[in-house]
């Protein structure tokens, strides 16, 4: 029996974006932090337990710049240069996130999930390495 799967353009675009995001793994990136550690989300009111920002000049599946969580920096920062160690691929959303860390820092998948749970608990996701 042969199974044929049809993928509509939207799903293909999401898969393609996800594959492109894997290009960042292991690379050093300059990021801009627009939601500093301890700041309050303007719409939903939760507090950011980590610095959260984006990679300038990129585009994610939601049409905005590619978002990222900055782990291991325990003070609010405006910009940062760090290494991408993982991609948070949202299965039920178009908005993947990068995991950025300071040099020589490593986090297990369990540790990453614990640190990003404040926001990712609303989405099905996998950690891609």
Region locations from a protein language model:
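Hydrophobic N-terminal alpha-helices or hydrophobic patches in metabolic proteins across all domains
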Residues: 16-129
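N-terminal amphipathic/basic-hydrophobic helices that include classical n-h-c signal peptides
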Residues: 1-15
